[in-house]
Amino acid sequence: MRRVLDALYMGCGIVGAIFLALIAAVILYQVFGRTLGYGIPGVDDLAALFLVATAFLSLAYTFRAGAHIRVNLLLHNLSRPQQRLAELWCLIFGAGLMGFLTYYTAEMAWESFVYGDRAIGQLPILMWIPQGAATLGLLAFTLSFLDDFAAVLQGERPSYEKATEIDVQGQG
């Protein structure tokens, strides 16, 4: 199960990075097109949809890598058992919140699929496609919260602490 989850997080991160590169590619294409005197319709629409995929698909990977912003001021002033309880509370709260968002994003994507909703803009892209990417990213993010919750519950450190420790020591 560990390998499957790690592959999911890594896969989402890779796909998010690919969409980030695609944003750069379509924007450069538009800039050079305008320089040469021809407009390219729909590039802004594509860049916006690629941004949705980049942002949501990268959430779980960056969380596991310890790249999300965390405020540890309170945790450092607690005893070790209190730190563990606070960590567990934050992880289960985050999992619940992300689960809520995942459910409603999936419901919205399903309704868009059923009704054939299309983007308003120069490119009438089916809305369930970017909404589906957002749902997949949120699902992976929810799983990463639950994954770390299970780890902390078993007495291990969460992935984001392990990742930042390795990086600080220059081994990452």
Show where each model-derived region lies.
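Alpha-helical transmembrane segments and membrane-interface helix-loop junctions
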Residues: 1-172
